[in-house]
Amino acid sequence: MLVEPQADDFKSAKQAPANPHWYKGAVFYEVLVRAFTDSNGDGTGDLRGLASRLDYIEWLGVDCLWLPPFYASPLRDGGYDISDFRAVLPEFGTVEDFVYLLDEAHRRGIRVITDLVLNHTSDSHPWFQQSRSDPDGPYGDYYVWSDDDSRYADARIIFVDTETSNWTYDPVRGQFYWHRFFAHQPDLNYENPDVQEAMLDVLRFWLDLGIDGFRLDAVPYLFEQEGTNCENLPRTHEFLKRCRKVVDDEYPGRVLLAEANQWPSDVVEYFGDPATGGDECHMAFHFPLMPRIFMAVRRESRFPISEILAQTPKIPDGCQWGIFLRNHDELTLEMVSDEERDYMYAEYAKDPRMKANIGIRRRLAPLLENDRNQLELFTALLLSLPGSPVLYYGDEIGMGDNIWLGDRDAVRTPMQWTPDRNAGFSGCDPGRIYLPVIMDPVYGYQAINVEAQRDSASSLLNWTRRMIEVRKQHHAFAEGDFVELGGSNPSVLAYKRTWIRPDGRLDIVLCVNNLSRFPQPVELDLSEHHGYTPLELTGGVQFPDIGELPYLLTLPGHGFYWFQLLDADAKARRGE
């Protein structure tokens, strides 16, 4: 058997403050370690470089960092092809550097989660090398092997651009191995109890070091069963319950976030039993919502958003959705109809180079043609719709992309800190940087960077920071009930978020969003709140009191309002 490092071999980080439901009110920020800051001049971002930028992340208002894989890897799939679950990729640093990052983050009240790729490993992982060379050895059954490639024929191929089958022949073992993703990423065999125990030990290793949780990558595909599509199988949920029990019993306060690109009715199963408040994952991404936000604004109609939220089941009390606009992958269009996918390609990916797999490899600002009003509207929706928002590094300053780079590298370029050499990312020769910094006239680092925007009160960065600050002042955004209000104008999306405070008082937030590029009026039935006063949250301006008649608002093109609805007692407490 292989000898694995243990957490006791390393110093562990200080724990974050105890708060079992911290994730419900958190603002998440996805950072690619490679892309954030290079501390040693080798052209690649690293853990020490990321630690040096924690003051900025704290200033922005971020509660939790999400780090995609930083493990040892041959890097054929951006680190999702892991060759050692207990080692850090040398160019990123060491396990000790990761513990230092955790310590520094926790000292600032920032939590850290990372991806754990449960479904597969790299084909260079020692487990796979042992499995292929010694079928009767201890690792012989760690992967899914077959004498032919006819099994599980109903399972779809995910990477249709590059893969023609989910089976690949291995000449060393003389059998086919199963892979739901790339051929160099063989799937682990979760029918083998030893595999389950090995992955639970990986979970414990990083939790012992102090990490605050995991985004569980590609969870729907852990098990296979003939005659099914090999997704969302009951055995998968059984294993996730085991993971959750380990967390609850041994590491309370840590979080499991499911990455399941499925319909809401399927994803809700990953929260587990509602009677227990949820006994699988604490959080899950709401993938189908994201493309429908883009569709709704381009069609100037609230119905794409309204319909998907209406199809979203209630989730257990202890759980929360994760919502996002962009991340390190393509803007995935798996969870839309063929007609909707064609529409999205026509509107947002006019150049064929902008497409990747079943999606669009562009950043937020270029998708929205660098329109400040749209950027603000999209961010306001992200921060106010049900769920914990996940920002993608650089979107807070409106960073661009580079569609001339291969695959998803288009949206993974270095963070733009200053207008200086290499955008302040690295002091190395520009030719050594892992990817070139953006240098075009609109999105280039000379024009778009943190330094310039921090000094400008009206910048997108300072506006985003202010909106995060406002969100945190009203817990209704985090845990409030969501009620869509309809209204007289289909171009306007209006909803209430209502939260009952511990003292029994209500925190009611009204959000009104104009999805049209033109000014729009709307009449809302707010008679339930007759006598209440809407207080606009970004400027503190009071609007006319609500009466029994429909409440009339006029919004500028792509404009929005956030109001707190104040009753007589609330106004009295404000001294009015």
Q: Which residues fall in each region the model found?
A:
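Active-site and adjacent substrate-binding regions of carbohydrate-active enzymes
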Residues: 1-576
